[in-house]
Regions:
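Membrane-proximal periplasmic segments of bacterial cell-envelope enzymes
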Residues: 2-279, 285-298, 305, 368, ...
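A short acidic/glycine-rich loop-to-helix N-cap element
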Residues: 657-667
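Beta-lactam-recognizing serine transpeptidase/beta-lactamase-like catalytic domain environment
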Residues: 75-77, 83, 291-306, 317, ...
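Gram-negative outer-membrane assembly/targeting C-terminal domains
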Residues: 679-685
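Active-site His/Glu-centered metal-binding helix of metallohydrolases
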Residues: 37, 392, 396
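Solvent-exposed, polar/charged alpha-helical surfaces in well-ordered, non-transmembrane soluble domains
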Residues: 96-107, 208, 212, 236, ...
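Short, basic/aromatic recognition patches
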Residues: 48-60, 321-343
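Short N-terminal helix-loop-first-beta-strand/juxtamembrane motif that initiates sensory/input modules
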Residues: 65-69, 217-221, 335-353
């Protein structure tokens, strides 16, 4: 009876279970259908993009850089185009595949003298799977396993295998080394990346053959590359350099470049103009799309965005004028060498600016090798070398007196021998002959008075000069800050804002004495670059408005021959600051600078500016005392000037350091001749 009941129960329960099972199956099907509906209808675009991203990838490659031209359109740097072997690597290529490709490629290209490292030889040796396996198996356990007995990562194993390879195992023939040279380059290209393979220059027949059989060597093709050639000019040193494809992005700047869309092997400017205008000169990248089949193999490569050459830059400097200034400096320097005055001099430097726009008209330098006597162009030295300026900075000292309420207008002070308690007297160059007498600010510039500057510097310390006075130095630091602050308004001891990286801001010591402070007032302590001195005098010429010097006039496109095309962007002047003195005080400086060149007093210091000048010149002389190797006394014979006096269109600074011919004030003559040259090339109104 019980058995019969059980059978009845079981027969009734089977349909219930089947119904439950069918319900679950139907529910699962509904879920799947709902999910498919969500994927294929509601979120179709998302999944189509995801599928596409899994079956295709994009790669970019750089194009030729823009070029650099002088103000007249003459090239300073050019691209030399060439046909090269390119390699695009798929993610399926093994070391064995790369070895086979290198072997085939070597039959079509020439390799003169491969320069290989032991690491490259070891990489090639271990590219054989059997050799690599045996090498790893032969490693001691601590080189294969970690402390827990687990196998080390593949990268650690590989490095240990490389370290274990003996030099005797790397004995290859010259032909094999050529193959290894190609293999190393192929192996350095990342998955889905494209790299240039270095070979000897390809001839037309090699290009044609490689292009025709490229299908036999997966990833190999012919493309156009370029070499950067800096032409031999007097401006070569400021052009800068570009990294090679092998070097790629500088390590210290790689992260910043990658964020901008660069690739690791992109060639970029690494110094001076090439670096400053990197984004302008860099070509537009080409974009290619690699399509993969369902197995992940490269199926096709499509160009979706063509690359193009970068934009060009044209300088403010006319190479003809620059070369003439260089020749002028060299002539003066050779003359001083002949009379013995320049034996210990490092060279001579000059900068010419447009005071209103900041355009650099020339930045010339002649470098003197003290060991060999060789003279070489050194335009870069105008922004990297620093010198003691001498009296040319006295207008800035007077300005500091005005700014801080120590001087008032064309104030008269007594030019006299300055004697502090326990120290030697400080004199102007004429004090012993003429004694004490009153002079104005204009005359202090015209005569180049040291003692006027010393009394101004004392005033910044809150003290008035008395003979044999004791000087308290409690205000020394604040006084130096005031003086240097005014100097900085003129561009002295601070960045000029020039469009070149790594300019020197001068040598401005943090440690100094009272004597250093006093002599700094007449230009005998802090050191400045010729460019800073040029900006200083340009600021005076421009009524106190300091404008950043700039070497680049504008950005230009390319013509149909990839040369200098139409103007894209005219670069505008950048005003940095205005010197904090009144217009009437600035006119006093103008009067003083004019009198330096045109004054009729027996104490006038700069008549050489105007003797033979083609236009009216205003300026300031400067002599900084120094000593050379054998203890012989020397001077830095410096000068700053602008012209025409009533409508300045050029401002010039000249530095001639360590001239032992103490009676030859050659600086003003050089400045005058530079202005005369400019008048001939670019007549001024």
């Amino acid at each position: 009876m019980r058995l019969i009941c059980m059978r009845k129960f079981n027969s009734h329960s089977i349909p219930i279970r089947l119904n439950l099972l069918f319900s679950i199956v139907i529910l699962l099907f509904m879920t799947i259908i709902g999910r498919l509906l969500y994927m294929q209808v509601l979120n179709k675009d998302f999944y189509e993009k995801k599928l596409a991203s899994a079956s295709q990838t994009k790669i970019t490659s750089s194009s030729a850089r823009g070029e650099i031209y002088d103000a007249s359109g003459k090239p300073l740097v050019e691209n030399t185009l060439k046909q090269v072997v390119s390699f695009t690597r798929s993610n399926k290529m093994t070391a064995t595949d790369l070895k086979e490709t290198a072997k085939k490629l070597l039959t079509y290209v020439s390799i003169s003298s491969p320069n290989l490292t032991e690491r490259q030889l070891a990489d090639y040796y271990l590219a054989d799977p059997e050799i690599y396996k045996k090498t790893v198996e032969a490693l001691p356990s601590e080189k294969r396993l970690d402390s827990d007995g687990n196998r080390l990562s593949e990268s650690e194993l590989y490095n240990n295998a490389v370290d274990s390879v003996q030099t005797s195992q790397l004995n290859y023939t010259e032909d094999e080394k050529k193959e290894i040279y190609l293999f190393s380059q192929l192996n350095a290209v990342g998955n889905f990346a494209t790299g240039t393979i270095a070979t000897d220059p390809l001839n037309d027949s090699q290009v044609a053959v490689i292009a025709s059989i490229s299908k036999e060597m997966p990833g190999i093709s012919i493309s156009t590359s370029w070499d950067r050639k800096v032409l031999e000019t007097s401006l070569s040193s400021i052009v800068g350099s570009v990294s090679s494809e092998k070097a790629g992005l500088p390590a210290e700047e790689a992260e910043a470049y990658l964020k901008k869309g660069y690739s690791l092997n992109d060639r970029v400017g690494t110094s001076y103009l090439e670096k400053q205008y990197e984004e302008t000169l860099q070509g537009k990248r080409s974009v290619k799309e690699i399509h993969l089949d369902k197995y992940g193999n490269m199926e096709s490569v499509d160009t979706i965005e063509e690359g193009s050459k970068g934009n060009n830059i044209k300088l403010t400097i006319d190479l003809a004028f620059q070369d003439s200034v260089d020749a002028l400096l060299k002539s003066y320097f050779n003359s001083e060498l002949e009379n013995g005055g320049a034996k210990y001099s490092e060279g001579v430097y000059a900068v010419a600016l447009n005071p209103k726009t900041g355009a650099v008209l020339s930045m010339s330098g002649i470098k003197h090798d003290l060991k060999t006597g060789e003279l070489t162009p050194d335009s870069l030295g105008t922004v990297t070398n620093v010198f003691v300026p001498g009296s040319v900075v006295k207008a800035a000292t007077i300005s500091s007196g005005w700014e801080n309420g120590v001087l008032s207008g064309n104030q008269t002070l007594t030019d006299q021998s300055i004697v502090f308690q326990g120290s030697a007297p400080i004199n102007s160059w004429y004090t012993q002959a003429y004694g004490s007498f009153p002079i104005t600010a204009v005359q202090a510039l015209e005569y180049s008075s040291n003692t006027y500057m010393v009394q101004t510097a004392l005033g910044l310390m809150g003290q008035t000069y008395q003979p044999n006075m004791f000087v308290g130095t409690s205000n020394l630091e604040s006084a130096m800050e005031k003086l240097r602050s005014t100097f900085g308004e003129y561009g002295l001891g601070t960045a000029t804002g020039i469009d070149l990286p790594d300019e020197s801001t001068g040598f401005v010591p943090k440690e100094y004495s009272f004597a250093n402070y006093i002599t700094n007032a007449f230009g005998q302590f802090d050191n400045y670059t010729p460019m800073q001195l040029a900006q200083y005098v340009a600021t005076i010429a421009n009524n106190g408005v300091r404008v950043a010097p700039r070497i680049v006039e504008g950005i230009y496109g390319n013509n149909d021959k990839e040369g200098l095309g139409d103007l894209i962007q005219q670069l505008q002047p950048t005003e940095i600051n205005k010197v904090n003195i009144s217009d009437s005080d600035m006119s006093i400086l103008h009067q003083g600078f004019y009198q330096v060149a045109h004054g009729t007093s027996g104490l006038t210091t700069g008549r050489a500016f105007s003797n033979g000048a083609l236009v009216s010149i205003s300026g300031k002389t400067g002599t900084a005392e120094s000593y050379v190797a054998d203890g012989q006394q020397a001077t830095n014979t410096n000068a700053v000037a602008y012209a025409p006096s009533d409508n300045p269109q050029i401002a010039v600074a000249v530095v001639f350091p360590h001239n032992t011919n103490l009676t030859n004030g050659v600086g003003p003559s050089i400045a005058r001749d530079i202005i005369n040259l400019y008048q001939k090339y670019h007549p001024m109104n």
